[in-house]
Amino acid sequence: MDEVNIIDINDTTEQSLVGNEGTANGVVVLISSEGEREGPPASDPIHYSLARSLSDSVGQRNVEDDDVVLLENSVSVSFSLEVEGRFQNDTAIESDNEPASQPQTQTFKRSQSRLLDEIENSGLSISALSDDEEASPLVSNQRSVIHKNIESEVKSGKYIIPLPQSSPLEKMSQVFNYQLASSPTPNKSPSSRSTLPVKSPLQLSTTVANKRSYREVQPPKFDPYLTRKLKKPQNKATADVSSVALDLTKYMEDCHDLYGTLVSDTHIRQQRSLDTKTNSYHSESNYEHDSIVIESDEDDDITNTRQEKPLFVQHSSQSTPVSSNKLALRQPRHVEDEKIDKVKPMVNARPFTDQEYSEMVKKCLGTSEMRKLYNECNKVSRTEETIYNEMILTVNNKVMELIHSKHISFEEELKPLTIIQNYEEFPIIRFKRKCRSIYDQTHGVFYPCDEVIANESICVLVYEALPFFHRYRTDKRGLWDEIRQFSKNGMKVIVVMYGLNALRKKLCNMENRQHEDRVLEQLSGSASSQSQSKTRRRSTQETKMRELNIKSKNLDRIINEVTIYANVDVFPIENLNEFSHWMKNLVWVVGKMRYDVSVKYKEWSHLNVKSGKSPTDVLYSFLQQVAHVNEPKAKRVVTHYKSFQSMMNDMKAGYVAQSHDNKPLMPKSLERALHTLYTSDDPNELIFTD
């Protein structure tokens, strides 16, 4: 196998090449230069200098200028040849025994990054990374090293790497074992990390005759920031080295099937290669074999933060930009896999067309009786008695029996609400509504109709604290499924838990007694008999709490977990007496939801609407609340302008009226603010600038 070394022509350190009997086989020299060179290799002084250096090193062997090839993006490569002796002049090859003396140039680091991106994005069908530690030399702690061992697994055992047609090396082929070593540098610069791939990929072909122009076959593109997302903590053994390990074994095998022969369906093969890369990068099971692992120094953290795309939040009190990657909150798997419908608060509603709207309005205004019903169902405000007459509660029989066992008159406290028992297996309370109108979602009006019983999109689950947490410890999955089966159907689920404070106090007392027992056991022998007597007097409820094995301080954490993972709202209450009052308030909230203007007009619900007695009162209140004008100045403006619209007409015309005493009606700052308010089309423009 041959060896490839990346060198910097600006580094003049002399390095001897020691191989078998003083020869070094298969040396490929990579150089970089500033800017792109379109001329032939013979006209390039850098190529001429390199060829001259090679000629001096090999002695009698001739080195042609064609041995040095210029690729795009200022990357030059010389083909493999046997060299005896030493490189001199201004060309040097790095070795692991003696580091180079001069630092790496910025241009060379940029070219090195381009080469790495070119190898990664090209269609090379090469198996990656041999695990043989003896085959790869040790890496110095003073420089960044990029290792990539490429072993052939094709039956022929050889790869032909065709370069662009202008290259004189198209006719030559070798089998390489790459080890790319850079010049010594402590850290990688930001520009070398974010450099885009080169435009001329190395495409694989089994025969020279199957070569295509490199312009016809472009490498598949993917997210250049993908490698940064897969960054892992650095190994302490390479604390001083910023290295990139490319383990692309499975990926290269797939690419060989895609790019082994270049046939006519090039675009299809490129898409398949892109899918292969994307799946390998995002597959959790293949991270060990199909990933790019980036290791960097701790000093590189500042540089890495610069490369991340920050998310700037306007009007934020945070002084530093927020990384968008850190803000990406991953939902639990059960939430991702299931499509939860949005809650639909408006029942018995549908959109009406303009023709249907005109027909319904004509029908509602046809007779006095229909007109009365039409006005009744479109009232803005509803009384509490009207809301309770519309609502129906279906309570589970087990919950009802539990309430009656506590001698609570549940039906009497919720009158005139209609209560019906249901016999479901879950402790659930459902809400229903007697609808005597249908809502037009397009035009925002109600039409009278026959009475229809509709199901509201809210339900209540009632649990006692101790059995709930006991089931959480023994059958968490079943508890999740029981709660979430309602939220998956578009229901808003509310979990009511009674007896939580009593359970917390009992757990605290039990923990204190356990602590006392442990202390007494360590004091005297008589204490052991006392602890045994206490064990005999232990109650059944305390035994259940011991089996619960939950500390009192963890109860709130479990409630938060239920709220997040089960997608519900948890309301702990003291006892069932409090539950009846709580349910009455909940019925009022659910009942008036259908007539709430913020629900009916959701697209305008963010606006704060205030009403006034008259147009003059509206303008007077506006000047005080929005324009921050005191009462005398507001009254002065209102004496001339009687409405908000009259002032707007004058502002758009470009003038403001004077007062009766021939003095300005308002201050200049207020004029500018009102003119901006009336004429601006930019929602982000400031009204007051001083």
UniProtKB/Swiss-Prot annotation:
Keywords: DNA damage, DNA recombination, DNA repair, Endonuclease, Hydrolase, Magnesium, Meiosis, Metal-binding, Nuclease, Nucleus. It comes from the Eukaryota. It is an enzyme of class 3 (hydrolase). GO terms for cellular component: nucleus. Residues 181-216, 521-543 are annotated as: Disordered. The keyword Transferase does not apply. Interacts with MUS81 to form a DNA structure-specific endonuclease with substrate preference for branched DNA structures with a 5'-end at the branch nick. Typical substrates include 3'-flap structures, D-loops, replication forks and nicked Holliday junctions. May be required in mitosis for the processing of stalled or collapsed replication fork intermediates. May be required in meiosis for the repair of meiosis-specific double strand breaks subsequent to single-end invasion (SEI). This is Crossover junction endonuclease EME1. It is found in: Nucleus. Interacts with MUS81. Belongs to the EME1/MMS4 family. Residues 524-533 have a biased composition (Low complexity). Residues 181-210 have a biased composition (Polar residues). InterPro entries: ERCC4_domain, XPF_nuclease_EME1_ascomycetes. Its cofactor is Mg(2+). GO terms for molecular function: DNA binding; endonuclease activity; metal ion binding. The lineage of its organism: Eukaryota, Fungi, Dikarya, Ascomycota, Saccharomycotina. The keyword Nuclease applies. GO terms for biological process: DNA recombination; DNA repair; meiosis I cell cycle process. Its EC number is 3.1.22.-.
